Amino acid sequence: MATAAYEQLKLHITPEKFYVEACDDGADDVLTIDRVSTEVTLAVKKDVPPSAVTRPIFGILGTIHLVAGNYLIVITKKIKVGEFFSHVVWKATDFDVLSYKKTMLHLTDIQLQDNKTFLAMLNHVLNVDGFYFSTTYDLTHTLQRLSNTSPEFQEMSLLERADQRFVWNGHLLRELSAQPEVHRFALPVLHGFITMHSCSINGKYFDWILISRRSCFRAGVRYYVRGIDSEGHAANFVETEQIVHYNGSKASFVQTRGSIPVFWSQRPNLKYKPLPQISKVANHMDGFQRHFDSQVIIYGKQVIINLINQKGSEKPLEQTFATMVSSLGSGMMRYIAFDFHKECKNMRWDRLSILLDQVAEMQDELSYFLVDSAGQVVANQEGVFRSNCMDCLDRTNVIQSLLARRSLQAQLQRLGVLHVGQKLEEQDEFEKIYKNAWADNANACAKQYAGTGALKTDFTRTGKRTHLGLIMDGWNSMIRYYKNNFSDGFRQDSIDLFLGNYSVDELESHSPLSVPRDWKFLALPIIMVVAFSMCIICLLMAGDTWTETLAYVLFWGVASIGTFFIILYNGKDFVDAPRLVQKEKID
């Protein structure tokens, strides 16, 4: 049993110090943070001055250094998600960012503006839905990983034992991490999605849980973070675990998703779908092998399901992925290419059964994790399906939900919830819960990476592709286009700041946020708008003859269209690009 973190806290604020008081039964600890020296110490309740301003909080997210100095980030609101084997799981829904400094008079105007921008970045990340924590249970590990731990591991604090891939406030907690005596004040926070449901089939009640854990390594937004880095971390890597708890028995099925693990990019350039660029100079095999070496160590066998198009702009990526798997020649890897869009065109989504039939035997070999009511491990999951499309969102989520249902069918039959021959699809009440949960999971993962809800969720929710779903996909695609081109640079900077990929240095002579714009950035859009406006005016206010009107319309029309294509040609100069961290530029 891990050493629990404190659940009930009070924050006492004085001009000199922050005091975080533990209010759990029998607790006398007070975490003290000096607002001048930034020193963190442990005190007792009698050390809190009665003059302090007091407020309840629900956890410490951590501290961060900005231009104005240090800031303390605390959780101010939470909602209960459910109970996980008698452990309460919470979603953090509101935060407060508190400055150590009492005044900003020591800052110049430029520093004040930069500090304001950095605070806006912090708040942007905090406002993204999907931060979860528990004060008594380790949410960062799967059931199978937790079952294979030593007694020493189980005695560690939640912070010490957490899987660092999924601790999104790891950088913010670095000061508390260095002092084991204050670990009970430190909450490892997960980013992703968690839902819990009490369900009933055949009069038998069981808990069904879905957890998606987003990796904080190579984290970012859709078009600015693709492929892998030099350490083998894949973009948009998510570990998804489905858990069943029935009569003391526990079963789980784990899947992963992650960007195609080679060095490639797809930077926005105002085009609806920028061309993917595969690096011609990077050592793809080195990064590829690093990625899968770590995946095999953590999860075992890898069944790779590549769902991207096998023609057009996506074809080179599919060929590269297949070549890499073949060249590595590992017996721990199986590669399956399934052209999702080709197979399911004309809304023939029933054809997904082709893929499910193809991998059925492999899924049976991989199995799932099962512990009986006596605590004995009955079955281990021997590997995972690693699914991907271009974004690892829409197509990926559809396939994962179908694979998870097949595993759940086997688990519930083995546990005696389903009768022999009974199909999960026939259990209408549970099916509704199941489909909606997986659609909600898709939306959460999509919003965190692409900025909008997922596409194709009408199929996940209903089992059918609908015309309304197509319209909603079109709307979400338009929103994605706007965000990817005109706001994702800020979103990427926000994530890099939050995760510590960029550290603020107030002594920097040049502000990283100040990026001079080329003359084209202002001049060309103005010319295009003026030319288009003149074209409309000429149409509305006809000249003396139709030839004169036509000449004016043609002139201004050609000017506006020509300017538009010049802007499109120079698209990368017009998009909102990250400013804090330069990712590998390989295009």
Curated annotation (Swiss-Prot):
Pfam families: Syja_N. Inhibited by bis-peroxovanadates and hydrogen peroxide. Residues 1-520, 570-587 are cytoplasmic. PROSITE patterns: SAC. GO terms for cellular component: AMPA glutamate receptor complex; endoplasmic reticulum; endoplasmic reticulum membrane; endoplasmic reticulum-plasma membrane contact site; glutamatergic synapse; Golgi apparatus; Golgi membrane. It is found in: Endoplasmic reticulum membrane; Golgi apparatus membrane. Residues 122-451 form the SAC domain. Keywords: Acetylation, Endoplasmic reticulum, Golgi apparatus, Hydrolase, Lipid metabolism, Membrane, Transmembrane, Transmembrane helix. GO terms for biological process: exocytic insertion of neurotransmitter receptor to postsynaptic membrane; phosphatidylinositol biosynthetic process; phosphatidylinositol dephosphorylation; vesicle-mediated transport in synapse. Residues 452-587 are annotated as: Essential for phosphatidylinositol-4-phosphate phosphatase activity. One of its GO terms (molecular function) is phosphatase activity. Detected in heart, brain, lung, liver, kidney, pancreas and testis. Its EC number is 3.1.3.64. The chain crosses the membrane at residues 521-541, 549-569. It catalyses: a 1,2-diacyl-sn-glycero-3-phospho-(1D-myo-inositol-3-phosphate) + H2O = a 1,2-diacyl-sn-glycero-3-phospho-(1D-myo-inositol) + phosphate; a 1,2-diacyl-sn-glycero-3-phospho-(1D-myo-inositol 4-phosphate) + H2O = a 1,2-diacyl-sn-glycero-3-phospho-(1D-myo-inositol) + phosphate. Residues 542-548 are lumenal. It is a multi-pass membrane protein. The modification N6-acetyllysine is found at residue 456. Phosphoinositide phosphatase which catalyzes the hydrolysis of phosphatidylinositol 4-phosphate (PtdIns(4)P). Can also catalyze the hydrolysis of phosphatidylinositol 3-phosphate (PtdIns(3)P) and has low activity towards phosphatidylinositol-3,5-bisphosphate (PtdIns(3,5)P2). Shows a very robust PtdIns(4)P phosphatase activity when it binds PtdIns(4)P in a 'cis' configuration in the cellular environment, with much less activity seen when it binds PtdIns(4)P in 'trans' configuration. Interacts with TMEM39A. Interacts with SEC23A and SEC24A; this interaction is reduced in the absence of TMEM39A. Interacts with PLEKHA3 and VAPA and/or VAPB to form a ternary complex. This is Phosphatidylinositol-3-phosphatase SAC1. It comes from Homo sapiens (Human). The gene is SACM1L.
